[in-house]
């Protein structure tokens, strides 16, 4: 047989076939799909069920670098979860602090701090001519519920972020519990309230009561370092009577001087409602054609909140026994701030009988035969505002009892300037709940604008209410004191770091405070009450309660029985009288 060459062998092969493995790749192995892989790949898991889905291409350059940049080219999974974990990975290691924390003493535990003197009838005292203003609720009937834990970003709440599921959710209790015999009539969210508007009326003075001392202008000077003045606790007779118990308002109502009656502290809360976060309540009494905006006995509306609008507001902390263990809780801070405001207004005036300014009538709530403490500097101005619209058949007038705290000589001459005096307080700039505030001792005079701007953000509702009260009273200026604790761990001693003055209208513009929106809210509530009782008998007394929801930016209007809260008031009075008798013994 003749030998064959390689060329002959190749030529003898079929032309349609090729030598070697098949060129098309088959992704099926015995009917099971599989993906090509490299034996050099280290697989940590059989499958990745946690990989990104439709959002894998979102996130921009950083997301691309994080997800795709350093992956293996051949045979790698689409997530780093396919990579084997290093045995000595310490990324999840953390250090636990097991040091003991010292227990802090609570400010005014077990009740409210009382402005010293006899009477002690509470904040919303009954009987127009008796009782001192009380700082706290005192009776423990839910006054502290108003300041329970809050959501993080004011009345808007906030969206959840990384690991927020693992954080304790903040919930608050209502300022007053809704009873079974109450009927809800209306629910309005703050977005709707913010759209209301009524041209702000100027108002006119009807009468004035009380007297004022002159403001001590030495407090306007920057204090010497480490030589600040201490805040003093002064014994003065101060009154905070609700609307329907005011004898002057009762007299004006009998003369048909107006249809709606209120006090500036109650009205300011209603006008600034969209800025509020904590729960509050207002009692509305409709008797005949008269409407009274009242506050109940022990209402939290009179307490001064602290950092209510801060992104990280103070929280309630309780131990296993349920007792408050911190002086920086919302309820403790509110008692402290109310005490500071009362005493600061008394301390910053020059008590001189020769130079005081006396109004047309004496203080309507003071009885010299019964009281032993001297009367505090306070002027009450009863002012009337026209809330009428063009389509109204009859005018709608509102009388408001406004307050001023002091007078000051006009620096350019002319009439004396009337002032309202308020105080902002710093508890601890490094503590939780401080809202990122600057250290007042070092920054108040060098960065005053930044300090005030931070307070506008953290205490929006408080400053808005004070500004509204000043405008309602037609005050010429506001004096804001900056007061800090002498020791951050003690709530009993305070120092005055400085005082800053503002004109109310200019301060309102800086805060973006729209009084037209506030008057629109008031007129809307009044119209709703009048429409509900349009078919009722004239002499029939109807009572309503307006409540701010503790956890949502919503207010609700309830119809309640006429005797609601009266039994609580009588029980509180009996308890206070019994306590007075025991103290005298």
From Swiss-Prot:
Region RNA gate, annotated ranges: 300-314
Pfam family, one: eIF-3_zeta
Ranges of Basic and acidic residues composition bias in the record: 43-60
Single biological process term from Gene Ontology: cap-dependent translational initiation
Feature: compositional bias, Gly residues: 109-130
Comp. bias (Acidic residues): 565-585
Single GO MF annotation: translation initiation factor activity
InterPro entries reported for this sequence: eIF3d
Record remark: domains: The RNA gate region regulates mRNA cap recognition to prevent promiscuous mRNA-binding before assembly of eif3d into the full eukaryotic translation initiation factor 3 (eIF-3) complex.
Primary role: mRNA cap-binding component of the eukaryotic translation initiation factor 3 (eIF-3) complex, which is involved in protein synthesis of a specialized repertoire of mRNAs and, together with other initiation factors, stimulates binding of mRNA and methionyl-tRNAi to the 40S ribosome. The eIF-3 complex specifically targets and initiates translation of a subset of mRNAs involved in cell proliferation. In the eIF-3 complex, eif3d specifically recognizes and binds the 7-methylguanosine cap of a subset of mRNAs.
Assembly: Component of the eukaryotic translation initiation factor 3 (eIF-3) complex.
Name this polypeptide is given: Eukaryotic translation initiation factor 3 subunit D
Organism in which the protein naturally occurs: Neosartorya fischeri (strain ATCC 1020 / DSM 3700 / CBS 544.65 / FGSC A1164 / JCM 1740 / NRRL 181 / WB 181)
């Amino acid at each position: 047989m003749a030998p064959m060459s390689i060329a002959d062998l190749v030529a003898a092969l079929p032309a349609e076939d090729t030598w070697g493995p098949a060129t098309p790749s088959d992704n099926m192995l015995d009917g099971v799909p599989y993906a090509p892989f490299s034996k050099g790949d280290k697989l940590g898991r059989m499958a990745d069920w946690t990989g990104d889905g439709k959002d894998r291409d979102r996130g921009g350059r950083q997301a691309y670098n994080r997800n795709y940049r350093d992956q293996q080219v051949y045979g790698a999974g689409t997530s780093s979860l396919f990579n084997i974990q290093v045995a000595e990975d310490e990324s999840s290691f953390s250090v636990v602090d097991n040091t003991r924390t010292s227990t802090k003493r609570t400010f005014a535990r077990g009740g409210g701090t009382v402005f010293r003197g006899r009477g002690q009838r509470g904040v919303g005292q009954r009987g127009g001519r008796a009782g001192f203003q009380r700082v706290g609720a005192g009776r423990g009937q839910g006054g502290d519920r108003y300041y329970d834990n809050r959501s993080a970003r004011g009345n808007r709440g906030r969206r959840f972020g990384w690991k927020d599921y693992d954080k304790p959710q903040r919930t608050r209790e209502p300022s007053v519990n809704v009873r079974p015999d109450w009927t809800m009539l209306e629910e309005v969210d703050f977005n709707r309230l913010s759209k209301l508007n009524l041209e702000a009326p100027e108002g006119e003075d009807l009468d004035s009561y009380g007297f004022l001392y002159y403001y001590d202008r030495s407090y306007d000077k920057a204090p010497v370092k480490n030589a600040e003045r201490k805040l003093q606790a002064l014994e003065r007779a101060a009154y905070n009577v609700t609307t329907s118990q005011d004898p002057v308002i009762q007299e004006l109502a009998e003369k048909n001087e107006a249809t709606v009656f209120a006090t500036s502290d109650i009205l300011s809360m209603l006008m600034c409602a969209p800025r509020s976060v904590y729960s509050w309540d207002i009692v509305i009494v409709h008797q005949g054609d008269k409407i009274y905006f009242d506050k109940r006995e022990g209402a939290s509306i009179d307490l001064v909140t602290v950092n209510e609008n801060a992104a990280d507001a103070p929280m309630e902390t309780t131990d296993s026994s349920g007792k408050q263990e911190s002086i920086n809780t919302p309820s403790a801070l509110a008692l402290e701030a109310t005490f500071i405001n009362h005493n600061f207004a008394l301390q910053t005036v020059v008590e001189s009988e020769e130079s005081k300014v006396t109004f047309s009538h004496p203080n309507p709530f003071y009885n010299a035969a019964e009281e032993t403490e001297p009367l505090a500097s306070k002027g009450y101005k009863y002012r009337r505002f026209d809330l009428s619209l063009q389509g109204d058949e009859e005018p709608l007038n509102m009388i408001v009892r406004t307050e001023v705290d002091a007078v000051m000589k006009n620096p350019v001459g002319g009439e004396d300037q009337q002032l309202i005096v308020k105080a902002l307080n710093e508890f601890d700039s490094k503590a939780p709940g401080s809202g990122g505030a600057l250290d007042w001792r070092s920054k108040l005079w060098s960065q005053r604008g930044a300090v005030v701007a931070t307070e506008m953000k953290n205490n929006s509702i408080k400053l808005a209410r004070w500004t509204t009260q000043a405008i309602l009273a037609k005050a010429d200026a506001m004096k804001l004191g900056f007061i800090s604790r002498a020791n951050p761990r003690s709530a009993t001693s305070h120092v005055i770091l400085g005082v800053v003055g503002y004109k109310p209208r200019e301060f309102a513009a800086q805060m973006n405070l729209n009084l037209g929106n506030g008057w629109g809210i008031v007129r809307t509530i009044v119209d709703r009450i009048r429409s509900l009782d349009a078919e009722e008998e004239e002499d029939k007394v109807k009572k309503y309660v307006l409540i701010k929801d503790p956890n949502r930016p919503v207010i609700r209007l309830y119809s309640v029985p006429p005797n609601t809260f009266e039994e609580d008031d009588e029980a509180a009075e009996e308890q206070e009288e019994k306590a007075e008798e025991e103290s005298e013994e």
